[in-house]
Amino acid sequence: MATETYKADGFDDAIVGIDMTTMPFRLIYERSKMIAILMEQDDMTEEDAIDFLAYNTWYDHGDGYPRFVELMDKEQAFEELDHFYEALGGTGDID
């Protein structure tokens, strides 16, 4: 079991919380803030920033590595779930 919590270097301003359901705990980053950071610091377009982060950062490296979330209100969350399940051919019923 890993005993370290890792961070995404250069993205401290995008930290929005801690996942305390795993050991070790994981930092939680807001994806849209990470995109904005790259756009400002590296003069990237939004599309380039998303591509870079998707390829280099937004996947699970294992225990202790960060989680990446998109913050939204409940209506947006339910709508996103509906779209996701619809794309998979399901009904998207949420209990």
Protein language model annotation of sequence segments:
Residues 1-94:
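C-terminal alpha-helical interaction appendages
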